């Protein structure tokens, strides 16, 4: 009898252990209260010639109001840059020249790099990610993401070199006043957003990271970015914004 009870107990423990250890498939998260911690560390992202640009676009760059940009501004193959002045650029302007052309080529390479990354413990997000705390690693969605209900936090858990990559198949949006918050030594320069179409940031929203959008990036009045706004084929539209390249 004792032997039978012992074997039964061991069988139960075996089922629990092997079930709990299975982690071969991506983790799906739909408005979760807790995000799984990833063990796979992401390698650095090489922006090369695009690394000095706070704003880089393909078609045009337009600004209204008192926009302030710290970092270089580049455009290629387009040639239309408007709004400086009254906008203030603390950096150099490179328009349809060899420097801007190379920066766009390097942006394309970096975009393709992060878009193609995979991981055994990648976390799949969907819909509104406001209110969540993301730890280092690779995240993806097959549709769009929004920071629309609560602020979004990145927690590097004390690792100042930790990399965050978010792959977005379609659009990225924030609603008015929403913020991205950094904690645990997280750095804006280590957060990378790969956006399959366009990104739009609501009035007075505060965002962080390098945004690499396939199409356009639009900032509503008073929105700010601690990072880089890099649009591959479309325009970057500004309206009294503050953008500081880390």
Give the positions of each predicted feature.
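Solvent-exposed adhesion/ligand-recognition segments of exported proteins
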Residues: 22-246
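Bacterial N-terminal signal peptides that target proteins for export
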Residues: 1-9
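C-terminal motif of bacterial Sec signal peptides marking the signal peptidase cleavage site
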Residues: 17-20
């Amino acid at each position: 009898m004792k032997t039978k009870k012992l074997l039964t107990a061991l069988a139960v423990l075996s089922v629990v252990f092997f079930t709990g250890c299975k982690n071969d498939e991506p983790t799906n998260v739909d408005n979760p209260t807790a995000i799984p911690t990833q063990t796979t560390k992401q390698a650095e992202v090489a922006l090369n010639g695009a690394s000095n640009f706070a704003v880089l676009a393909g078609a045009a760059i337009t600004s209204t109001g008192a926009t302030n940009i710290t970092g270089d501004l580049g455009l290629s193959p387009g040639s239309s840059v408007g709004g400086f002045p009254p906008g203030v650029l603390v950096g150099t302007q490179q328009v349809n020249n060899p420097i801007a052309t190379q920066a766009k080529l390097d942006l394309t390479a970096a975009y393709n790099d992060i878009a193609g990354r995979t991981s055994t413990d990648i976390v799949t997000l969907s819909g509104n990610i406001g209110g969540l705390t993301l730890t280092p690693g690779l995240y993806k969605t097959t549709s769009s993401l929004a920071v629309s209900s609560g602020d979004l936090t990145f927690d590097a858990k004390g690792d100042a070199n930790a990399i965050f990559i978010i792959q977005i198949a379609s659009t990225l949006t924030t609603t008015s006043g929403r913020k991205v918050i950094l904690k645990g030594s997280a750095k804006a320069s280590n957060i990378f957003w790969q956006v399959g179409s366009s990104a739009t940031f609501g009035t007075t929203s505060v965002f962080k990271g390098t945004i690499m959008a396939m199409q356009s990036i639009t900032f509503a009045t008073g929105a700010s970015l601690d990072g880089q706004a890099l649009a591959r084929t479309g325009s970057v539209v500004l309206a009294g914004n503050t953008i500081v390249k880390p």
